[in-house]
Amino acid sequence: MSEKYTLSLEPRAVVGKKVKRLRRSGILPATVYGKGIEPISVQVDARSFNAVYRRAGRTALVELHIAGRQPLAAFIHALQRHPVTRDIIHADFRAVDLSQEVEVAVPLHIEGESPLVESGEAVLNQVLNAIEIRALPSNIPAHLTVDISGLDAFDKSIHVRDLALPPGVTLATPGDELVVSLAHARAAEEEAPAAEETTAEPELVRERREPRAEEEEE
């Protein structure tokens, strides 16, 4: 049985620039939306949110308890981060109907070892890190596994259609899209200097300020 996650939220009246005060007091502003419901501005204890997000990610259901409302089943759908500290400064929850299929992005986890990669003859070229699937909310897996142990020749590759799906899950990403392939190690090494040259320029240091999206929140 999958772990159950819950969060207690409160309706939020503070919007715009004033939300900075909430963040300084350890409160994370958030929005709940979904099919058939009006967007709800809410706030949640930042530590509680971070603890749940670390375990649930964006593919596990979270039961939201909002004062004065019935509990809602939702996914953590989108995050806004501070451009310098990378702290989460806003979250979007996507409320769902448990009886209706949804389309979500699920991360791909590489498993096993290609004999050619293990011998040093090849390097792995991973094109996709996640794919879109359709399923009932309760059937959405935390991730999908990509077994590369069968990649024992350079002409072999793995496409989306080759991935094993749990019962009740179908593909939304086209099946002919490439997931992983092999490249000759020597060719990859020869290309590396050119790639390094393109990233040798130092990044410009921009003025530190809060993002416009934060200032115009809501």
Curated annotation (Swiss-Prot):
Compositionally biased spans, kind Acidic residues: 190-200
UniProt KW keywords: Ribonucleoprotein, Ribosomal protein, RNA-binding, rRNA-binding
Keyword Ribosomal protein: yes
CDD domains cross-referenced by the UniProt entry: Ribosomal_L25_TL5_CTC (cd00495)
Biological processes per GO annotation: translation
Ranges where the record places region Disordered: 185-218
Biased composition (Basic and acidic residues): 203-212
Record-level Gene Ontology MF annotations: 5S rRNA binding; structural constituent of ribosome
An example Gene Ontology CC term for this record: cytosolic large ribosomal subunit
Annotated InterPro entries: Rbsml_bL25/Gln-tRNA_synth_N (IPR020056), Ribosomal_bL25/Gln-tRNA_synth (IPR011035), Ribosomal_bL25_b-dom (IPR020057), Ribosomal_bL25_C (IPR037121), Ribosomal_bL25_long (IPR001021), Ribosomal_L25_dom (IPR029751), Ribosomal_uL5_bac-type (IPR020930)
Function: This is one of the proteins that binds to the 5S RNA in the ribosome where it forms part of the central protuberance.
HAMAP family given in the database record: Ribosomal_bL25_CTC
The protein's assembly and partners: Part of the 50S ribosomal subunit; part of the 5S rRNA/L5/L18/L25 subcomplex. Contacts the 5S rRNA. Binds to the 5S rRNA independently of L5 and L18.
Family per similarity comment: Belongs to the bacterial ribosomal protein bL25 family. CTC subfamily.
UniProt-recorded name of the protein: Large ribosomal subunit protein bL25
Gene coding for it: rplY
